[in-house]
Amino acid sequence: MKTIVLKLGGELVHAPELDVIARDLRVLVDGFNRVAIVHGGGPQASALQKTLGLETRMVAGRRYTDAQTLEVMKYVVAGQLNVDLCGRLLANGVMGVGLHGASGHVVQARRRPPRVMKGAGPEPVDLGLVGDVLGFNLPLLGDLFERRYVPVIACLGCDAQGQALNINGDTVASQLAGALEADALVLVTSTPGVLRDVNDPSSRIPHITHAEFERMVADGTISGGMIPKLEESFAVLDSGAKSVVIVGKLGEGDLAHAVLNPGSAGTVLVG
């Protein structure tokens, strides 16, 4: 029995590839593996903000979250996308249970204080209503796993006073993988892994070390949203998870293949 945390980017929730992923998940769950999904919703949130005439402000790949932006995230991520994702899973025989930070306090968080961020200069950055993960309701997740349900967790945390906080989905997935001591954290993105040239899918890097990551940030090869994604992913290797794999859109059977044959698909992070 393996424990797998799967992170889905918001752009995949309504993509045809999700049905392929869902069928692979059914195989994994039927094999008595424990699977949890964490999903974001950045593209949909940005689209709704544009429709509403609200500015989308990003700092070093992170979304600045004021009160209006948080309401958008609640509506899009914890609402529409979580429901739609659970529905697509159900249609493919997977029993997903939609959750967010306030659901049984499954994602326990506190508001992040200003801090210096890689790629954002030397001054501390205040990201607004953004949270840092403190922990998870592991007994609740354990009960769901035991009954072969798949927790589907929106990337919103909640503090002890009930205040919802926006949290980067990769952060939630990475820290959940560490807390569960997962056999694999799989990040499914719109690109086939970490690329030397973002315009060339064939430039996929099969394996990347932390030292190589630092060099690529310094020379600009890795930038934007990939920086926090990889930072959190490297950190999870020190917190209990056994492996991290970043993959693109998957074909039938590719999910298990990516986990069981590291480097055959996507990019595997090594210490």
Curated annotation (Swiss-Prot):
The record marks K7, K229 as: Transition state stabilizer. Its EC number is 2.7.2.8. Keywords: Amino-acid biosynthesis, Arginine biosynthesis, ATP-binding, Cytoplasm, Kinase, Nucleotide-binding, Transferase. SUPFAM superfamilies: Carbamate kinase-like. GO terms for cellular component: cytoplasm. One of its GO terms (molecular function) is ATP binding. It comes from the Bacteria. Its main location: cytoplasm. It catalyses: N-acetyl-L-glutamate + ATP = N-acetyl-L-glutamyl 5-phosphate + ADP. InterPro entries: AceGlu_kinase-like_sf, AcgluKinase_fam, ArgB, Asp/Glu/Uridylate_kinase. Gene3D superfamilies: Acetylglutamate kinase-like. GO terms for biological process: arginine biosynthetic process via ornithine; L-arginine biosynthetic process. Substrate binds at G41, G42, R63, N166. Belongs to the acetylglutamate kinase family. ArgB subfamily. PANTHER family: N-ACETYLGLUTAMATE SYNTHASE (PTHR23342), N-ACETYLGLUTAMATE SYNTHASE, MITOCHONDRIAL (PTHR23342:SF0). Catalyzes the ATP-dependent phosphorylation of N-acetyl-L-glutamate. NCBIfam families: argB (TIGR00761). HAMAP family: ArgB (MF_00082). This is Acetylglutamate kinase. It comes from Anaeromyxobacter sp. (strain Fw109-5).
